[in-house]
Amino acid sequence: MDKNEFVPSKDQEMAANFKENPSLFLRGNASTGKTTAALLRLETILHSQASGIGESVLVLVPQRSLGSPFQDFLSKQMSMASDQVSVLTMSSLLRRMIDLFWPLLASYQLFKHPYEKPAFLTLETSQFYMSQIVEPMLAQGKFSTVSLPLYRLCSQLVDNLNKSALVGFSHEEIGARLASAWLGDTSRQNVFSDVQEAVTKFRQLCLENNLLEYSLQVELFKNYLWSNQSFQKYIQNQYQHLIYDNCEEDPPYVHDILIDWLPSFKSSLVIFDENSGFRSFLGADPTSALRLSKSTVTTLQTTHNFVSSIPLQELGNCFLNLQNCKVS
């Protein structure tokens, strides 16, 4: 990072100093320099490493696109220490760890062919395999009150599975939870038992054929891998430093994992964007993310906006709080 481009604020300098602030929860509105502070901290960590003997850094982001600033920064570095940095989402970390520790997971005998390599399904391939379950059910008259085309129905069923894993309840409860939330015509209640039948058969298909769709990956990691002592020893030695940006955009299960994981890092920076959590339809939970502040030693609030003018900031505040709207 070119130090001549800007002068870091005191908050950014504080966040960058990983030795004096090894466990920091950084929060503030958009455009207050939080990600820039994270880049400064990453630069400080890399420059502190002896040549060729770097400590590993995990940069965790909720969406791959949010890792672009870190990827761009690393692409401009000439130091070998930059090779010690991994920019990952929790989803990509899950997949790596499940693939690496598959022999350990196989020992739990959850799958029909535990010693054969698994196939990781994308959203599209998950919907394809779901259609193999749903089509025969449609032929039997199931989902008779649903007017969605097949691909939309399969997409919704896969989404229900994923949401159950993200929020943290069993896929066996999906039908009952949908039924209890339904306020419409009781004649449509039968569709929820059809939903439960479909997701149960789909999960069985996955277990019989070593198919790992997203919700199953999450369950394997949370319920079997994360609690294993051998895995814990490996993962704690794998990364010494953590930078977790936009934690408010991740679902609760990620925050649960990080609450357990944070004490093992040599240094950690968790960044929370105020008035955010825009991916709530994908499971983002800002309220859950705030729990991470209790697992860090220091909390720092950024206030100086580096991008927006004062009138624009006031307008934004009006949208957030109409009763206390003040425009200069």
Predicted region positions:
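Hydrophobic residues on the short alpha-helix immediately C-terminal to a glycine-rich phosphate/catalytic loop
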Residues: 19, 41-45, 70, 261
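SF2 helicase catalytic motif II
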Residues: 238-250, 268-269, 275
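Motif I (Walker A/P-loop) of helicase-class P-loop NTPases
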Residues: 34-43, 254-255
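Accessory N-terminal region flanking or inserted into the helicase ATPase core
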Residues: 1-17, 21-25, 30, 37, ...
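Conserved RecA-like helicase ATPase core segment
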Residues: 256-328
